[in-house]
């Protein structure tokens, strides 16, 4: 395993073409965080990184892209979907989409909108994925059942 830490715009330049099997990342989006005033994350920066990812990911490789959207003036930005569509535009397949529920978040927000307590996990593949291990649900004895009475769980 080769783990790299740094600014993706710089780190990706040093990686050989079609040499990466898998990328897992949750990049900044919609300027929700301040990174020491060093990076203004915008669609141009995203496109540069996505283009480099297409160059370095092998045929059959995958990217797990975890991203959300900011709500601004009562409307979600749609950044996550714009990014997903751009990945498709440059040649990746949108293999799967999952929802990641963020722990310790509340579902209520302000301004007549629910707070985003989740992010999208887009799974992109370059061609057909070489390996895929589907997540299997853990069976629950209580699934589909209702409890009656005043019994409380402690």
Task: Walk through the language-model features, giving the residues of each.
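Core catalytic lobe of class I
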Residues: 1-154
């Amino acid at each position: 395993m080769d783990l790299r830490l740094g600014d993706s715009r710089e780190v990706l330049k040093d990686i050989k073409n079609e040499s990466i099997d898998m990328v897992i990342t949750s990049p900044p989006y919609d300027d929700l965080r301040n990174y020491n005033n060093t990076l203004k994350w915008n669609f141009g920066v995203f496109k540069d990184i996505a283009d480099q990812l297409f160059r370095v990911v092998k045929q059959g490789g995958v990217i797990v892209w975890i991203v959300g959207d900011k709500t601004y003036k009562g409307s979600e930005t749609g950044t996550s979907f714009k990014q997903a569509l751009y990945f498709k535009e440059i040649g990746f397949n949108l293999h799967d989409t999952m929802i990641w529920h963020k722990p310790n978040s509340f579902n209520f927000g302000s301004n007549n909108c629910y707070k985003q307590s989740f992010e999208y996990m887009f799974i992109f593949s370059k061609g057909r994925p070489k390996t895929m291990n589907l997540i299997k649900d853990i069976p629950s004895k209580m699934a589909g059942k209702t409890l009656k009475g005043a019994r409380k769980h402690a």
